[in-house]
Structure formats: structure tokens, C-alpha cells
């Protein structure tokens, strides 16, 4: 990702675009002396940022400085004919965006694969489900991974659609009429052929037909909002894992030699999950920046958006890249502590099954609201008893069994809270995994993708 967005790479991409346009112009009848294109090609990779900056200090124009630098190196002045600065920068930035999106697709597909693997591994690991962070019902650890995966699948599909439908601005000139190209090439048909050659060179499937100097900034909003959507599932799961780690239920991995705190030797913090949460907030900040550009275009275009885009676009991609790299590491190094999970589950289990007890009571002929009130009274009493007596046992089932108004025996209650079969979690996980398998088949490169080492 850093390579896609670094300054040297962008300059080389710009030079390649200049030469693609020049070659197309030559093919369409423009006089370009023999050897000129070859001379440009020879110096294509000679990027001296200091020299370009020195030129920019004088001309106060970044593209003009890069034109002068490339022409000086090649010894010719044949590039940029019939073009304006945005013909260069807009198309190259769109190429960078598409390349970055394609890399993100690979990383996200790899994350979906690992989510699927963890969902399968922990599909039968019953855990205390929580709403409002309070013990609620029994769920499985595998379902938590599957739920994150399904949210990420929707975001991933959106990114795929953005890539498939992303349009190139094309070579349109200062206000979008392509007048200079018509004059240069001698007709509209020739300009259309040039557009096709440029589109093919950049690897796009279609080009915008009627734009001004800049392409609509709502396209940038669509891209960055897609990245924010993609970050949501990792951030949600990371927060859940952080909460679970606070009860010693799971770990994101703790390597040999790692230190959790400079003050407290025992600490094993969920620093990577915390990083995921932080990077998701950073991404939302960049979305706010590009949102401010939507509906703010002056006439055919101006450069007030340039400052925002030069920061927000590359940095948004670097943020999602860091988030996904970290997420992949968490998924690879993740571990659970079954005995602690079981201990917590046993502590809460009767409470986690009050809805099942309620269903059993209504099936035995009791009115739902009457049963709800009776079970609630016993549950609150048993919970307070537990909190005030650390050594006490959970007496909820016995309290309900002893209540003559509730037509359920102790054995019937025990049967109602069994955790061997937890709803439809197994089918839900399998359904999500099937969709993920389709993603992996579309992106086979994700099978071998390895995240960078996270420091």
C-alpha cells in the first residue's frame, strides 16, 4: 500500500500516462520524431524529488515542475500536448485508488477466510452472550466470528462493486469539452479513439462521458465510505474480544518477550485489538474530510479540494491497510481459554436460560405475562443472593421448581437449560461459511496472503 501511494511511484505512473497519450497521439497521426518516445522511456524511472521541488519553488505549480523535469531528462518537449494538469493527476489518482482497492479486496478476502476458520473451530464453544454488556443468553464463540464475517461480507461485496463500476475521468481538457484534443487530432472520432487507448492503458472498463476539469468528488466519498464500512466488522469484533479478554476468556496472542505494561508486569493487554478500534476512528475522520467535498464543486472545477484529497485519500487507504493487517494477525494468533469460559457460563447459566424456561412454562399452560413476572421475581432474588454471597450457589432453578404457580419440575428445568444444542448457530455458521468460500474462489490470491509483522 505504501508503494502505491509513495511520491516516486506516482511520478512514474504520471510519466507512463504521458507516454501512453503521446503514443496514442502518434498512432492517430500526430508527428512525433523517431526516438522521442524511446528517449522518454530511458529516463522513466529517474525520479529526483529534490530537483522537482526546486522547480516547483520557482513555477509554483506542481505539474508544470514535473513536466519540465521529465522533458529535461529526455531532452524533448513532446508530452502533455492537448492536456491540462487534471488530465494527468485525476487519472493517475484514480489508478492509484483502483490499485489500492484491489489490494484491499485481497486482504479482506484473507480476513474472511480466517473468520470462517475461527467460526468453525469454535462453533461448539458455548459462551455467555451479552446485551448491554450484561449476561443475556447462551451463544457460541463461533457465532461471534460468523456474525462479524457476515457484516464484513456485505462491506466486501460493496467494495467489489465499487471496483467493478469505478469510472475513469479520461482526457477531457481544462473544462471537459476536449476542445484542445479535437484541434490537435483533427476530429471527434480521433479523440474518442485516444480515450479508448488511455482507458485500456490504465486498465479501466469505462470512462465518464461528460465531466468538467475534475471528476465528481462524490466518487471519492463513495470509495472512503466503502472503506469505513469495511472497517466496521473488524472494529466491532475487536471490541468484543477486548471485553472478553477483560474476563480472561480469550487472547489475541502474547508473544515471547512481549511486555504489556511498563509499570505492571502481569499485564497482557489487547493492544492489537485496541489499534483496530483506533484506526477505525481515524478512517471515520477521513470520511468526514471527503464528505465536505461532496456538493462543493465550483463550476467546472477548482483546487480547493486538492488539499483535502492529497491527505484523505492516501491516508484513508493506509489506515484501512493497517487495520486489516492488524486484524489478520489477531485472527491468526487468537486463542480461547475453555475452562474460564465454562466457569463463567456455569455461573450465569440459569439466568441465560430464563427465556427458555419462560417458553417451557407457557407450553405447560401458564400465561406468558404471569410466567414472566414470576420468573423475573425469582431471577432477581437469586442474582442479588449471589452478589451478596460470593460462596453461594445459583438457586434460581430450585426457586422456580419450588414455586407451586409454575408448572415445571426441577428435571424439566434442567432439560430446558441444556447447552448441547444452541438454537440454529450451527446452521448460521455453515451458511456464512458457504458465502465466504465463494469469495475465496473469486479471490484465490487471498489463500496465500500473509500480513506484515505487527509491531
Residue ranges and their predicted role:
Residues 282-368, 374-377:
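Long, amphipathic alpha-helical stalk/connector segments used for oligomerization, subunit docking
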Residues 1-178, 183, 189-197, 260-261, ...:
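A helix-coil-helix interface module used to build multimeric assemblies
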Residues 93-106, 120, 134-297, 304-322:
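Charged, flexible cofactor/metal-binding loops and thiol motifs
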Residues 85, 182, 186, 207-211, ...:
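A structural signal for small-residue-enriched, beta-sheet-centric alpha/beta enzyme cores
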Residues 2-7, 51-53, 259-278, 301-315, ...:
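Short beta-alpha connecting loops at secondary-structure transitions
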